């Protein structure tokens, strides 16, 4: 066997249907598009969300709220993820160095999820009550 002699197994490949190539093909004349109308023409399609002229659902529903820009620079870190940080001090830069958070994050809150086994010192990060209890139970401490 050589690379230049390889070919797919017999019957595993189907030739694409050639549209508009005679009556005998089964897809001649109109080519499966029916007769007349917008969708029979080339480039004839309606934009997504168009409902034939009636007021679209997107416009019938009221506007609601907004997307907070603060969410783009804020993150929650689980207690279990603190184990990924090398060293005993956990702060914004050490979390970024350990790839726990992305580089554009400015505000971090540590939440209770999972377990922590090593004693760490948390500096300059917000911490929930449950996470604070878990960190202190493991021998760590929280510094502002």
UniProtKB/Swiss-Prot annotation:
Tell whether Cytoplasm is among the UniProt keywords.
no
Similarity annotation = Belongs to the universal ribosomal protein uL15 family.
Q: Which GO terms describe its molecular function?
A: rRNA binding; structural constituent of ribosome
Question: Entry's Gene3D superfamilies?
Answer: 3.100.10.10
Annotated protein name in UniProt: Large ribosomal subunit protein uL15
State the gene name recorded for this protein.
rplO
Q: Tell me, what does this protein do in biology? A: Binds to the 23S rRNA.
Q: Which UniProt keywords apply?
A: Ribonucleoprotein, Ribosomal protein, RNA-binding, rRNA-binding
Note the subunit structure. Answer: Part of the 50S ribosomal subunit.
One of its GO biological process terms is: translation
Annotated Gene Ontology cellular component terms:
cytosolic large ribosomal subunit
Gly residues compositional bias: what residue ranges? 21-31
Which InterPro entries does the entry link to? Ribosomal_uL15, Ribosomal_uL15/eL18, Ribosomal_uL15/eL18_sf, Ribosomal_uL15_bac-type, Ribosomal_uL15_CS
The biased composition feature labelled Basic residues covers: 32-44
Q: Which Pfam families match?
A: Ribosomal_L27A
Q: Which PROSITE patterns match?
A: RIBOSOMAL_L15
What segment(s) does the record annotate as region Disordered?
Answer: 1-57
Q: Which domain of life is it from?
A: Bacteria
């Amino acid at each position: 066997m050589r690379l230049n002699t390889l070919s797919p197994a017999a019957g595993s490949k189907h030739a694409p249907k050639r549209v508009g190539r005679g009556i005998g093909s089964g897809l001649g004349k109109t080519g499966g598009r029916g007769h007349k109308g917008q969708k029979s023409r080339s480039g004839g399609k309606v934009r997504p969300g168009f409902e034939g002229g009636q007021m679209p659902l997107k416009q019938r529903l009221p506007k609601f709220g907004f997307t907070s820009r603060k969410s783009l620079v804020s993150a929650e870190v689980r207690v279990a993820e603190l184990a990924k940080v090398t060293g005993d001090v956990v702060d914004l830069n050490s979390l970024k160095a350990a790839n726990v958070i992305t580089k554009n994050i400015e505000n971090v809150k540590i939440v209770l999820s999972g377990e922590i086994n090593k004693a760490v010192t948390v500096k300059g990060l917000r911490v929930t009550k449950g996470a604070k209890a878990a960190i202190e139970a493991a021998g760590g401490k929280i510094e502002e």
